[in-house]
Amino acid sequence: DVYCKGPDYKDHSDDITGKIDDEEEAVKSVDGEIRYTEDITFSSSSLLNKFGDVYNDSQKSFIQKMLNSQDFDKIKSKVDNLQNLKVLVVGETIIDQYVFCEALGKSGKEPVLVLRDLNMEQYAGGAAAIARHLSDFCGTVSLLSMLGEKKEHEDFVIESLPANIEPYFIYKDEAPTITKKRYVDYISKSKSLGVYSINDSQMNGENQNQLHAYLDDLIPKHDLVIVSDYGHGFLSKKTAQNISKQSIFTTLNAQINAANIGFHTMNNYNNIDCAIINEAELRHELRDRESNVDLLMKELTKSMHIKNLVVTRGNNGAILF
């Protein structure tokens, strides 16, 4: 039997994934042989990048400059070196549910849109999603997070985590596991409604003591701490100060969302090595709608003693200060 591949795989060293060697070994194990076609090749990725409307003109220009000025092997080497990192992720685990619906129309008795549910998808989001993403290129990842008192969805969360993630959970008294359910039109994929199951009051003293004991034990065992503070009652001001005083590289993301806007702030933290927020969150933090972003970044880094601040700006990219 013959296993065919395109000519771009003829030189195995050009395959950055290294999977072509595994494929050849599998073919030979069943007495097959691998052959390569000879023809003009068209890379689907290249065609999409050239002719697809994924990026605007300024983004295309930036990508082209990056391609011309950066060495891919050097970037890949930097990413590969992350394999040696031991990373601790701290933050709320959020169960993201998406109910895909068909719109039936207006109710006959009330001015209400009526939907018929078709199917539901469920994901382990929040800090669990961050940990799962990191596990792809970091060898050891620990997740310190919060679930509800009755441990709802715990099995689902654990099953969704790769083998190189070690989870540690605080079970918040008198609270459910945070669940955010969105109703989505199955054709347009636009969201019609969101329903949150959440108790976002601060954890009681016993729960906080458990969290601080975990932090004191786990932080010295890691090279990096990533804090994802969703403002749902897991990380109090005292906890933020506890994390800030640790002598370890600490990265912070403190998000604004529908449940915490007006009450959530980054200023509980101090001496952060790297903070990542979007422009709206930066302006919200400083109560400033109009000033230049660069000036606001300078003000925030000075007031919170942030060494590196990244502000994302949607299709305008990101700024590092």
Task: Provide a role label for each language-model segment.
Residues 9-21, 101, 232-238, 285-287:
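Glycine/threonine-rich flexible loop motifs
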Residues 88-90, 194-196, 223-226, 251, ...:
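Structural motif
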Residues 76, 237-321:
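Conserved phosphate/ATP/ADP-binding segment of small-molecule kinases
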Residues 87, 141, 167-168, 250, ...:
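Hydrophobic anchor at the start of a short beta-strand
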Residues 8-11, 93-94, 198, 230-233, ...:
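Short glycine-rich anion-binding loops that position phosphate/pyrophosphate groups of nucleotides
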Residues 1-68:
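Nucleotidyltransferase catalytic core that binds NTPs
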Residues 66-104:
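Positively charged, low-complexity intrinsically disordered leader regions
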Residues 95-226, 246:
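Conserved N-terminal subdomain of the carbohydrate kinase-like
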